[in-house]
Structures are given as C-alpha cells and as structure tokens.
Amino acid sequence: MLDTPSNRPALPAEIARRRTFAIISHPDAGKTTLTEKFLLFGGAIQMAGQVRAKGEARRTRSDFMAMEKDRGISVSASAMSFDFMNKGTNFRFNLVDTPGHSDFSEDTYRTLTAVDAAVMVIDGAKGVESQTQKLFEVCRMRDLPILTFCNKMDRESRDVFEIIDEIQENLAIDVTPASWPIGVGRDFIGCYDILRDRLELMDRADRNKVSESIAIEGLDDPKLAEHVPAALLEKLREDLEMVRELMPPLDAALMAEGSL
C-alpha cells in the first residue's frame, strides 16, 4: 500500500507529540544506566541493564559496540525511542545517549544541535564535574531547556543544598527542585515529588520495578508517617520549607528558554 497523504497520519499532530532529548554528564555519573531506566519505565524493554555488569549479567542496550561493552563507556551517540502516555496524549520520546568522555565529545556536540532539551546527570557524591560543565555550556549556547538529575542518592552523597549551590555558582543558572530525596545512602527510601505532592518510593528488592507512587495532601498529611520514618520525615519537612522560602517557583517559560 502506497504511503499517500490520505492514509498518512496528520503531520502536525505527529510532530506535536514528539520530544527529542539528550542525556549529558561527566563519565561514570550514571548517564547510560539512566537511559536504561527511561527505556524500562517507558515500556521499551523488560529489564534494565547495567553499564558495569559482570560475566553474563545483562548489559545496557545503548552501549552496543565491543569497546563500549568491554570498557563500560559510551563511545558514540545512540538514539532510542519509546512511547509514554501522559494526560491523554501518547508522546513519542526520542532519547539520545551521548558519550561522556572528552575523547569522544565531538559526537556529543553534534548531537546537541538536534535535540529539544537535555537531561544533565550529576553524581551525588561528586557534584558538577569538568565535562558536565563543558557540555552545559554547549546547551547554553543553544538555549536548550535543561533538567538536572542528581544520581546515586542511594550511595553516600553530598548534601543536596550543597550540590544546588554548586550548580548555581559553577553554571550560573537558577535552580528550582522538582523532587527531593528522602534520606541518602543506606537511609534512602525514595523521593518526594514537589510538583505533584506524591511519594515515589524505591523498591529495594527489585529496582527493575516501577516504585510505589502515593498521592498525599501536602507535608502535613498523616499518610506520610505511614511510609516515612520519623527522623527522615522531620528532615524532609525542614528541607522543603527551606526550598520554598529560598528558591524560585517553577517557571515554565524561563525553563523553556534555558534560564532555569
């Protein structure tokens, strides 16, 4: 059957539902592993791989070259697509996993000319690193909207406020948290979704499962105490009070122009 205008999906609608974004980071911040999680929760794969998987353990799909598998690094940019339903719209996400090592940064620079936005991954223990800063500047030149993902919070990490201060100082950009970790290291149990007032709890037994999501009525909701230990809950409330007092609210227009 010929692909004619009459049987082809409406072009404007197809364009409107598509989003293309790149993931950028310093080497070993967890960029490719995050890519796997996007694919998993987007329904594109059944089990997330690990960059440093040993033996016959499942490895990542985006690192497909022999060198990438052997060394646990991304050498070239790889593009993957998955659908995700949100508020009645079936969005098509085109995800581009980029090389983190400076030796292969030319491929990353070219990739960033073709995306709508970027997800910047930061190691919670190391903060803003050199290659992250270089890639951020490339995004800034294109006025790309940037979402920052602070990774490895289930390991010993720096204080979140310290990381935010470093982002604002080193990258000269305002920061508005959209979610907040509950505990760090061994005490990490999940995140509080600030924008939607939800608890996103981590499944410690199987991290390939979507975590439990619980709707709550603000930080005074009694349901919080049912799921969050008292010490962590007190710390969460103190942290979010500071966030709301000291940091700007989310401004979609500023974010879209790459200023937030």
Name each model feature, range by range.
Residues 2-29, 124-260:
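P-loop NTPase catalytic nucleotide-binding module
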Residues 2-122, 128, 177, 231-235:
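P-loop NTPase switch module centered on the Walker A-proximal segment
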